[in-house]
């Protein structure tokens, strides 16, 4: 996957383009957006989640139930369950799933949510609740 602003990204991109061609590259990008749509729709259609971003992006930002996103992501990592990032915007923290792996299919995306939910529900007494930002 490409990083932001790294010098060798141009070489990676050129090599990928030469290997798969323009149509192949388009297919990879389309697939990445399809997997982000699968994840976003899962979050939107599940009342236990709060979605923080809509639109055309590979990042899906959300919270699960009332759990603190930073702590949930950290504990998932230390428990060797998932490695997922968290982010913040305007004082709100959220889980930030980036669907940048072209090998992932729908089953991997759904498995991600299954693992997150199972871990959070089994460890709910050990996880902090998130603080809600009060807007004046």
Language-model features, listed with the residues they occupy:
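Conserved C-terminal alpha-helix-loop-beta "cap" of PLP-dependent enzymes
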Residues: 1-6, 17, 21-133
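Catalytic pocket-lining loop regions of alpha/beta-barrel enzymes
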Residues: 10
């Amino acid at each position: 996957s490409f990083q932001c602003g790294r010098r060798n990204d141009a070489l990676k991109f050129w090599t990928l383009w030469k290997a798969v061609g323009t149509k192949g590259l388009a297919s990879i990008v389309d697939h990445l957006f399809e997997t982000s749509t699968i994840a976003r729709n899962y979050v939107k259609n599940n009342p236990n989640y709060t979605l923080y971003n809509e639109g055309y992006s590979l990042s899906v930002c959300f919270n699960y139930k009332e759990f603190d996103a930073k702590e949930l992501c950290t504990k998932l990592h230390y428990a060797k369950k998932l490695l997922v990032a968290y982010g913040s915007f305007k004082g709100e923290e959220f889980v930030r799933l980036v669907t940048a792996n072209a090998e992932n299919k729908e089953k991997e995306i759904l498995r991600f949510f299954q693992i997150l939910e199972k871990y959070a529900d089994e460890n709910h007494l050990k996880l902090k609740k998130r603080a809600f930002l009060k807007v004046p």
